[in-house]
Amino acid sequence: MDSKIMNVLVDRVLELGPKVEDSGPYRNFKLTQDGDGIAWLLFDRAGASANTLSADVLEEFDLVVAALENQRPAGVVIRSAKPSGFIAGADVNEFRGATDARVVETSIGRAHAVIDRLEALRIPTVAVIHGFCLGGGLEVALACQSRIAISGARFGFPEVLLGLHPGLGGAARFTRLVNPMQAMTLMLTGKTIDARKAKSLGLVDAVTEERHVRNAVRDAVFGRLKRARPGILTSILNFAPVRGLLASRMRSEAAKTAPRENYPAPYALIDLWEKHCGDKAAMLAA
């Protein structure tokens, strides 16, 4: 068979690491380890065609991260076992009809803590992303040290379209990783970008095909993959005096289509960036 045809067929099959013989102790995740000592964490939400971050999923995710803290594998790769994509975001159905702001804040705080715990792992963490990586899914990816995109992947923070903004630390991580004007524009508009654009921005470290995933993962875990680093322009644009000027311009642009009294979320995001971006810990806590 022609090699090009073979490559097309191979790239339709997700590379999910070692075969998992049983479901293990988790309902929504599968955890195994390959011959290189790399843990493969597969996100496969039970009874759903797409992965979303619900309260029960995040509770179990926290248990998985705790297990990784104890096992200390050579590294961990996080993948979706769903053909539809990586993670489609938070399960917003859990917040419909909520009347007590304190309950919502508590739920968000718990989710935030899980993502922070993932970021704090003292082993290489690699997100391998296919399909849609949106909202909370991008929050998970940003908490990893490396991000590898499969051609065709799409990235974005659509929360603003729901009257929200990234609430699990993604705003802090995103604006410190890539040009904050680009990052803020994406968050303020809710637009998505493809894998190539994500690579050019520095959001992902590599774009590859399924047949090359294992090699890309090894390169990331063992330090052979060149990781995207924030450039000098990113540092300059995040500098407080410059930030103030840019934030003022962002508010003016937002006001043209989204008055503050009707659409507070974009302005809350701009305020968050302007006030706290110089201190990541403060921005994460805000």
Language model: regions and residue ranges:
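Amphipathic alpha-helical segments at domain termini/boundaries
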Residues: 2-42, 139, 186-286
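A structural preference for short, pocket-lining loop segments at secondary-structure junctions
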Residues: 36-42, 58-102, 113-130, 150-154
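A short, flexible beta-alpha/helix-coil linker loop
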Residues: 45-49, 94-95, 275-276
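Glycine-rich phosphate-binding loop at the start of an alpha helix
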Residues: 89, 105-108, 112, 135, ...
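Short amphipathic alpha-helical boundary/capping segments
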Residues: 116, 174-175, 255-260
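Crotonase-fold acyl-CoA enzyme core
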Residues: 119-234
